[in-house]
Regions:
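N-terminal carbohydrate-binding accessory modules
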Residues: 1-62, 81
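Substrate-binding/catalytic cleft of secreted carbohydrate-active enzymes
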Residues: 54-62, 67-188
Length: 188
């Protein structure tokens, strides 16, 4: 047959394990020293440029960090490539909120229920082959986790992530103050 299309994609192979003794990469006990990295590049704005992302990752590595959490959306492909090259581990995060507002101007609303599956699929399909990605976060300080309905949604999202990638753990950030307010039926 005739070649219709081709793609060259770098990927990495490594083993990850967690147990009562810690986190292990390729059998070696590994302590994570991490930072939250927002998607902006200072004066460059929210654009992602390879050189800027590599520079940022290199500065973090030289400062002693070996891990980052994307705050609070999936990480750019340029930053993931830099983390792959420099040996920086990544917690790949989806959202900052689901349905309950953290401030009057955020995007928390019922549309979350229509789009979360597509967001999860897109992130995992894009980032799966990056060895730097060691885990997924399905939310940052999610208020709904203070409610039974929120906990059920968390389980549903986590299981959906695992259906696409059972090799990496899934976590979700909890803010007990916001969760307590949500439990009482209050949001911001």
């Amino acid at each position: 047959g005739k070649l219709l299309d081709s793609v060259m994609k770098r990927f990495g192979i490594r083993t990850l394990a967690w147990n009562g003794n810690g986190f292990f990469v390729n059998g070696k006990n590994t302590l994570l020293r991490g930072a939250c990295v927002h998607h902006d590049n200072g004066i460059l704005g929210a654009c992602s440029f390879r050189d800027a992302e590599y520079r940022r990752a290199k500065i973090l590595k030289e400062a002693g960090f070996n891990a980052i959490r994307s705050s609070h959306n999936p990480i750019s492909s340029h930053l993931l490539e830099a983390c792959d090259e420099l040996g920086i581990y990544v917690m790949d995060e989806t959202w900052d909120y689901w349905l309950v507002h953290k401030n009057p101007y955020d995007q928390a609303n019922e549309n979350f229920l229509k789009w979360w599956k597509q967001d999860v699929e897109s992130m995992i399909q894009t980032d799966y082959n990056h060895p730097s990605v060691i885990m997924y976060s399905i939310g940052n300080e999610i208020s709904e986790l203070g409610t039974v309905k929120g906990q059920e949604l968390c389980d549903e999202i986590a299981n959906y992530v695992r259906a696409f990638d059972e090799t990496r753990p899934v976590t979700c950030g909890v803010n007990l103050l916001l969760a307590g307010m949500a439990k009482k039926g209050k949001g911001l």
